[in-house]
Amino acid sequence: MLQRFYDEGLAQASFLVGCDRTGQAVVVDPRRDVAIYAAAARQAGATLVAAIETHVHADFVSGARELAETGVRVLTGPGADLEYTHHQVRDGETLAVGEVTLTFLHTPGHTPEHVCLLAEAAGQPARLFTGDLLFVGGVGRPDLLGEAQTRQLAQQLFDSLARVMAMDGAIEVHPGHGAGSLCGAGIGKEPSSTIGRERAQNAMLQYDDRDAFVRAVLADIPATPPYFARMKRVNKAGAPLVDPSRKLPALRPAAAAALAADGALILDLRPAQAFAAGHPYGAINIGYGAKVGYWAGWVVPPDLPLILLADEPAQAQEAAVQLLRVGLDRVEGAIAGGFDAWVGASLPVAEIPQITAHDLRAAIDRGEPMHVVDVRTPAEFRGGHVDHAVNIPAGEIPARAGELPRDAPIVTICEGGYRSSLAASLLAQEGIAPLANVTGGMAAYRAAKEVTT
């Protein structure tokens, strides 16, 4: 029995692993909305007997405590020291799940307590669940516990990877993250691999010298969202128990406005163009889709009450679940009737002026004063950008808005308009004006061959 559950927004994988004959199963690295695992187990005629944490996660809220409350046993690596009932396994310890034998391998490096899980059963391929140690095309980052531990963890990462690479090349590799995750660099899109394939093709596994590996892995560290440190604390303590299926309250526009006046933040989930044309004053724009939780984790303070504005109630409901996955629990409700109802109630509205790539180029050629802020990643920026643009990735805008001069209009640009709309809304919150966002983004610039490299 093997079923993979994948959160596209956080690029996070969890697994249901078990024995078809005896109907026993475990969950590996569960996310917070745990009902999906119970439902999958029921459908398979199985009973959940354990939740296994490969490590204390930094990028999402674990569902292990939720499962513990239902009587499921929680297993972790040595030294995890969770603040709720759990069992810390020893290196080499085994767990029988029906006719499937699970062997725990202590593999420090990404974190000190990290374990991999080897699943073996007669007539089945051996499978290694590698958590954040080994990815398809990449390896885990060793820096999330702070500078003082980074070098030692990087050295341990090398040793743990060497141990895993000495295993049978036919063993399947099932990592905890896919492309887009910030838990490692260079992660591929494929959901799984094999030891042999990674041994041959993974660039980070071609180092025979530990010091050379350490230099390489530390030279390619992804950005670190500010919510990562908070997630570590939440997962160590055990996340507060919540009901992800709770129906969001429908807030009358006037009630939502009153909450906003008292400090609540309105998250406008509509597309960038709709947001630009008009939105509740003070709202920020995180367009509905798989990345709502990801971007909110970057830019939303954790204890702030939130109000959602969406085109459809179902979008607000799904967004609220995504927010729970990154520990943003204080969603007060969704605005009933959406933006039309807000306007109909004569409540304050703001706009974000838009400018096309062609008009921006013309303004630059005329020498009009402006500051272009490219909110893509540094790697994207290095691949080509607008003349004289400065690079501040969208997620860093709240911390770095003060770096921007106020002597000329600010113009935000990204690849297609999603991130730059978020950035523009954050800058508007800071009172920065005049302000404009580039429609079509760098895609339009490339089409017009207007790029500086």
Role assignments for model-derived ranges:
Residues 1-47, 117-131, 137:
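Conserved beta-strand hairpin/beta-sheet module of binuclear metal-dependent hydrolase folds
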Residues 2-5, 15-16, 94-123, 249-252:
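Core dinuclear metal-dependent hydrolase active-site scaffold
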Residues 17, 29, 55, 67, ...:
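Divalent metal-coordination and catalytic microenvironments
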Residues 28, 48-57, 73-79, 106-109, ...:
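Active-site neighborhood of phospho(di)ester-bond hydrolases with catalytic His/Asp-centered motifs
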Residues 30-31, 56, 79, 110-111, ...:
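Active-site metal-binding loops of divalent metal-dependent hydrolases
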Residues 32-75:
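Active-site metal-binding motif and surrounding structural segment of the metallo-beta-lactamase
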Residues 126-127, 137, 151-244:
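Divalent-metal (often Zn2+) His-rich catalytic cores of metallo-beta-lactamase-fold enzymes
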Residues 141-143, 197-239, 244-245, 264, ...:
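Rhodanese-like catalytic fold shared by cysteine-dependent sulfurtransferases
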